[in-house]
Swiss-Prot record:
<dbReference type="InterPro" id="IPR000873">
    <property type="entry name" value="AMP-dep_synth/lig_dom"/>
</dbReference>
<keyword id="KW-0436">Ligase</keyword>
<dbReference type="GO" id="GO:0016405">
    <property type="term" value="F:CoA-ligase activity"/>
</dbReference>
<dbReference type="Pfam" id="PF00501">
    <property type="entry name" value="AMP-binding"/>
</dbReference>
<dbReference type="GO" id="GO:0016207">
    <property type="term" value="F:4-coumarate-CoA ligase activity"/>
</dbReference>
<feature type="binding site">
    <location>
        <begin position="195"/>
        <end position="203"/>
    </location>
    <ligand>
        <name>ATP</name>
    </ligand>
</feature>
<keyword id="KW-0963">Cytoplasm</keyword>
<dbReference type="GO" id="GO:0005829">
    <property type="term" value="C:cytosol"/>
</dbReference>
<feature type="binding site">
    <location>
        <position position="532"/>
    </location>
    <ligand>
        <name>ATP</name>
    </ligand>
</feature>
<comment type="function">
    <text>Involved in the biosynthesis of prenylated phenolics natural products which contribute to the bitter taste of beer and display broad biological activities. Catalyzes the ligation of CoA on (E)-4-coumarate to produce (E)-4-coumaroyl-CoA.</text>
</comment>
<dbReference type="GO" id="GO:0005737">
    <property type="term" value="C:cytoplasm"/>
</dbReference>
<dbReference type="InterPro" id="IPR045851">
    <property type="entry name" value="AMP-bd_C_sf"/>
</dbReference>
<comment type="similarity">
    <text>Belongs to the ATP-dependent AMP-binding enzyme family.</text>
</comment>
<feature type="region of interest" description="SBD2">
    <location>
        <begin position="338"/>
        <end position="405"/>
    </location>
</feature>
<dbReference type="Pfam" id="PF13193">
    <property type="entry name" value="AMP-binding_C"/>
</dbReference>
<keyword id="KW-0547">Nucleotide-binding</keyword>
<feature type="binding site">
    <location>
        <begin position="438"/>
        <end position="441"/>
    </location>
    <ligand>
        <name>ATP</name>
    </ligand>
</feature>
Amino acid sequence: MENNKQDDHQEEFIFRSKLPDIYIPNHLPLHSYCFENISQFKDRPCLINGATGEIITYADVDLTSRKVAAGLDKLGIKQGDVIMLLLQNSPEFVYAFLAASYIGAIITTANPFYTPAEVAKQAAASKTKLVITLAGYIDKVKEFTGGESGVKVMCVDAPPPESECLHFSELTQADETEIPAVKIHPDDVVALPYSSGTTGLPKGVMLTHKGLVTSVAQQVDGDNPNLYFHQNDVILCVLPLFHIYSLNSILLCGLRVGAAILIMQKFEISKLLELIEKFKVTIAPFVPPIVLSVAKCPDLHRYDLSSIRTVMSGGAPMGKELEDAVKEKLPHAKLGQGYGMTEAGPVLSMCLAFAKEPFPIKSGACGTVVRNAEMKIVDPDTGASLPRNQSGEICIRGKQIMKGYINDAEATKGTIDEGGWLHTGDIGFIDNDDELFIVDRLKELIKYKGFQVAPAELESMLISHPNITDAAVVPMKDEAAGEVPVAFVVRSNGSKITEEDIKQYISKQVVFYKRINKAFFIEEIPKNPSGKILRKILRAKLVTEQAI
C-alpha cells in the first residue's frame, strides 16, 4: 500500500505490508513475550539437540533458563551488565540468552572463529563482564579475562585443568526462586550483536526488548502471520545463533509459537540431510551457500525430505537460477526469501508465500515490507523518495529497528535520520505488487564508464553453470573504464572449465559492460556467517594478483 503525502513540497512514497497492522504487546520483556503462551505447550519439545538426540521440553527450557538467571545474579551479573556468548549453537546458548533477559542483562554474541584480537576488541567495546564459551576457545579470551580484569570466564564443557574457568553447571544448579526482582523497561537493551563490519569497523547494535518483541510479532503473530509457524513444526537451526537472523527468525520466532527447534552445531551436508529425515523437519531456514549445497548435493535422492514445507533464505540475495534448482529438488516445499539487516532488528521484508493465507510471489523477490512498519526507497544522491519500480536506497521505519550503535552517536546519526528512517545502504525497488527486489549494495556496485554493474546478477549466472560450485564478482581498477567486473570461481569437483569458457558463457547473456574481464579460480569464496561475500578479501587478492 502506498501513501502519498506532501512534505516540504516534496511527494513522499511510503510502502506498507499487504497484511493489516496488529496489536503487538511490546511492553513485555522479551522472555515474557516468548513464553506468553507456554501453558499451551509446556510438555511439548522445545529444543532438540542434533548432536545427542536429546529432546528438551518447553517447561524444562523455561525452568533451566530461570535457574541460570538466578545463577548469573549470584555470580554478580546485574541489570545492564554484558555477557558475551562465544559459542556454537547449543542448548546452553538458549538458556544463557533467555536468562540474561530475565535479569535485565545484555547478551553480546561473538563468532567462535574470530581471532583473539577480534574477540578482545568486542569484549572491550561492549564492556563484557562474563564470557560463556567452550574449553577449546579459552585461549582466545585469556588476554582480557581473569585476574585483575574482573572479567569472568565460564565453560559449557569441562574447563581446562588449572584454569580459573567456571563451569556452566554452577548456573544450572542455582535456585530459580532467587531470581532478583528487576524492572525491565521496553527500551532497555537485551541483545548487542556486532554488525559485520564489511563497510567499516564492527559496531555494537543495540537491540531492545521492545524492538525484538516487535520484530518477532511482525513475523509470527496475528490471525494471518507473515511467517506461519505452529506448534507441530520442527524448525532447523543450523545457521549460527550468534547471527541475528538465526537468533530472531529461528529461535525467538520458534519459541513464541511453541515449535520444536532442532539445533545443529555446524553445517555438514550429510548430517544436515540425515537430521531433516530423522526428525521430520518442516521449516528449513537457510542462507544461499547452504541452499546451493543442498541443490548441488549428489546424494540428495537418498534422503526423505518430504516433511519440509518451507525453505526460507536470507542473509544474502538468492538468484532465480538457484531458486529454480531448489524447486526442482524440493518440489513440495514453499521457497522464498526474507531480507534483513542487523540494525533493522533485523527483518525488513518477508515473503508472503510463507503467510498462513499466502499471496502469490515472484521469483527473485525478497518479500514485502513487514507489517507495523513503513518502507521507502530514496534517491541516494538527493534523498528524495521514489515511486514504484525505481531503484534507490531502501529505508525502513518502525519500533523494531535498533536503538542505535553503542557509544557511537555519530554512526547512529549517519544511519537513522531525524525522521526515524533507518538507511540500509542497500539498493532496491518495490514493484506494482508491493514486492521488494534487491539490486545490490550501494558500495558494491561496479562502475564501468559510468554504467552500473551489479555483482549479484553476474554471480547468479555463474552459479547456475553446472561446472561452477560458487562464485563472486568484484571490481578491478581499469585505466580506460574506471572499473571492470572480474570473477572468482570455485570449480565443481573434477571440472576443467577455463577462464575463456567463463567469459564466453557470460558474454552471451549480458550487455557489453557487464562482461567478465578476468576469472580467477579459488578453493572457496570467503563469506561471513550470514552468507554475505567478504568482498574486501577478494579485492585485496586482486591487488596482489595485479602486482604479480
